[in-house]
Amino acid sequence: MKFKSTKRFGPITTGHRQWRDRGHCSFIHGYGRYVRLTFEASELDERGWVMDFGDLKDVKGWIEDEWDHRTLIADDDPLIPQLKELEEMGGIDLNILPEGYYPGIEESCRYLYDMINPMIKEKTNNRVEITRVEIWETEKNQAEYVR
């Protein structure tokens, strides 16, 4: 039997640009993103919990450091030189994602999983892992990454 619990963070005001899009998503735009992480364990801890939500301050801080009022772009965005110039002038707080990740919510789910799941496994001695990451950019638009 598996036990699951979820934790939701947000809204986290985040901008991004999807330069490969042929439409308006190629422009810098943003949303108040909500993130929901699903934790899974075969055994509960000594308190009967899957995850101690009070022990997620570092996870919340990491997400906020990466996303809050920042603009996410892919590492192969052709406007990187101009965006870096704008950042130097104080007009943007740029976050160039690692190679292979893109700023849309689908890839953002995978990025969070890849970055945060090792943190969770370490803090729980491999007892807990993330099995689902969901992100909402609006009430109507949501994506998820499922392990």
Task: Label each PLM-derived region with a short phrase.
Residues 1-147:
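Charge-rich, low-complexity N-terminal segments
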